[in-house]
Regions:
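Conserved helicase NTPase catalytic core signature
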Residues: 64-257
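P-loop NTPase Walker
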Residues: 1-38
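Conserved AAA+ ATPase small/helical "lid" subdomain
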Residues: 38-69, 73
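Phosphate-binding glycine-rich loops and adjacent basic patches that engage nucleotide phosphates
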Residues: 2, 51-55, 154-161
């Protein structure tokens, strides 16, 4: 049985059509960049500090921490859903380092923050925070796992979101052609947009876990790739603030030899 275009995205049956101007816009390559910007709009940072508990102690996670985590994840060049783990890891690293500096700095050596904590202390804090529901909630709020229908639905029904994603790309008239009421059915010309959004989002990362016979080899490979991406990210960082630009990656040092 031959499938029509409206049946070619899993879980979506599109039968409605668009106006000719909307079809023309949706069929243009301009939509690739617009979808990219639409996805980036979901990658947010805290507007103000949020208090969580670290090792049983109240601790403030700052907007700067989430900003640096976002910069690291974006610079990895990974699809949005795969880059979420990098955002998570970097945010935990930021929290651990700041907390260690707060409670583990020798007053006689203030230029060496966290000196009083051992490597084991750092490892325990990192593991606890990676599994912390409060940290996971921050990750979900600022770098959620997304689906293609979410991206396209919000893009085409939220004027402000569409205007921001298409800034300098589409005219006001073009925006008007694309906008539709919330809960409108997907149209046949939406299917290529859904495909593009799915491509840019990528698959969600696998949960980190060990099998009965030991560590999951595939997960180890993915973690190693994530580590390389993080190192490369520091070399090609889309700097979120000036402090990020001071990072010297081990990748750079290795590459220089």
């Amino acid at each position: 049985v031959l499938m029509t275009l409206g049946d070619m995205f899993p879980g979506i049956t599109a039968r409605a059509d668009d106006s000719l101007p909307a079809q023309e816009i949706k069929g243009s390559l301009l939509m690739v960049d617009i979808i990219k910007q639409a996805i980036r709009a979901w990658q947010t940072v805290l507007a103000e500090p949020v208090t969580i508990r670290v090792d049983g102690t109240p601790f403030a996670v700052t907007p700067q921490m989430t900003r640096r985590a976002r910069g690291r994840a974006r610079a990895s060049r990974r699809p949005h859903n795969r880059a979420r783990q990098i955002f998570h890891d970097k945010l935990v690293e930021e929290i651990v380092n700041a907390y260690a500096a707060e409670i583990g700095t020798d007053p006689t050596q203030p230029d060496r923050p966290g000196l009083l904590l051992s490597a084991s202390d750092y490892a325990d804090l990192t593991e606890d925070l990676l599994n912390s529901p409060e940290v996971q909630a921050l990750v979900e709020d600022n770098w959620p796992i997304l689906t293609a229908p979410q991206i396209v639905e919000r893009l085409l029904t939220d004027r402000r979101h569409l205007e921001e994603a298409s800034h300098t790309i589409l005219s006001d008239d073009d925006v008007d052609y694309l906008l539709r009421a919330k809960d409108s059915p997907f149209t046949v010309p939406d299917v290529p947009l859904l495909d593009e959004a799915a491509e840019q989002l990528g698959r969600p990362p696998r949960p980190r876990k060990a099998t009965a016979g030991g560590e999951n080899w595939q997960q180890m490979v993915e973690d190693a790739q994530d580590a390389l991406d993080i190192l490369k990210a520091s070399a090609s960082m889309e700097f979120e603030d000036e402090s990020d630009s001071e990072i010297l990656a081990a990748y750079d040092i290795i590459d220089a030899h």
